[in-house]
Amino acid sequence: MKQAVYVASPDSQQIHVWQLDSAGELTLLQTVDVPGQVQPMAISPNQRHLYVGVRPDFGIVSYHIADDGTLTAAGMAPLPGSPTHIDTDRQGRFLFSASYSFNCVSISPIDTHGVVQAPIQQLDDLPAPHSANIDPTNQILLVPCLKEDKVRLFDLSAEGQLTPHAQADITVAAGAGPRHMAFHPNHQVAYCVNELNSSVDVYQISNNGQEYHLVQSLDAMPADFTGTRWAADIHITPNGRYLYISDRTANLLGIFTVSKDGRVISLVGHHLTEAQPRGFNIDHSGNFLIASGQKSDHIEVYRIDQNTGELTTLKRYPVGKGPMWVSIRGAQNS
């Protein structure tokens, strides 16, 4: 099984395309020069398109993904603000872009060729939205707003319009700073990493996906850590057994075990990683984690122990300057 790994390096305006084999080895396939500082990336649900957000000319570049994982540019569309995080709906019809600095979220249609078009809606006055996350039902968009310590909830219509959800916004602990989210594969639990206190909140999803209730909040840092907390990313293994977060001050990956129903997580350890791990991801087999070092200009591959979730370092690889994002496309026909 061979997968494709995409690493976005904004300071050199590049995407490095790698092939990941079943042993965890990476082979460089392509280096793509991007028209701007590339940061957030998202892969279409059918795994045939890669979308990347760029600045300072704010926009989304659409790429077609070949069978071997290499990229061909297919189009570019404008955005109303600097893209911080992007996601697509689960049918590949719409792309959502959260702009932290411009306090907005925009919705862009995706045409039948998989190319993102100009936005059709813009939601303003959102205090520092750090991500836009479509829920497992494809009906609700969750937007963590870091500066107001809330996760905003919006209903998504069939036409790609967002309206406030019936449930009140989720309020997190004061000063926590909600940032990125992940969903358990059972679709019944959501996780949110909080940037400013490096904690993880666990939410039970009920009423056919319509309600979110906090069931646990857990510190992700070592007990003796006294530095500034600065969490970044969060991902869960495809089997739902292990959850990971990154902290950029400590240069750590936090390792959690997850209960069978997803509602209880337990911190079991930490693994030192690349300098300032802004982004990481887990491959589709659940065997490997790949982390990027924004200050090291390298990525590092780890093997995930299937019995404990602990990480074993395999190899590090040079990439572009200031790598911030890692996306992984599954093996074709797998």
UniProtKB/Swiss-Prot annotation:
* Record GO terms (molecular function): 6-phosphogluconolactonase activity
Report the EC number(s), separated by commas if there are several: 3.1.1.31
Q: Which InterPro entries match?
A: 6-phosphogluconolactonase_YbhE, Cycloisomerase_2, Lactonase_7-beta_prop, N2O_reductase_N, WD40/YVTN_repeat-like_dom_sf
Asked if the record carries the keyword Cell membrane, the reply is no
Q: Which GO terms describe its biological process?
A: glucose metabolic process; pentose-phosphate shunt, oxidative branch
Q: Record's superkingdom? A: Bacteria
Catalyzed reactions: 6-phospho-D-glucono-1,5-lactone + H2O = 6-phospho-D-gluconate + H(+)
Q: Which keywords does the record carry? A: Carbohydrate metabolism, Glucose metabolism, Hydrolase
Q: Which residues form the signal peptide?
A: none
List the GO terms this entry assigns under cellular component, sorted alphabetically: cytosol
Pathway field of the UniProt record reads: Carbohydrate degradation; pentose phosphate pathway; D-ribulose 5-phosphate from D-glucose 6-phosphate (oxidative stage): step 2/3
- Top-rank EC class of the record's enzyme: hydrolase
Function, in words: Catalyzes the hydrolysis of 6-phosphogluconolactone to 6-phosphogluconate.
Protein family per UniProt: Belongs to the cycloisomerase 2 family.
Protein name (record): 6-phosphogluconolactonase
Species per Swiss-Prot/TrEMBL record: Yersinia pseudotuberculosis serotype O:3 (strain YPIII)
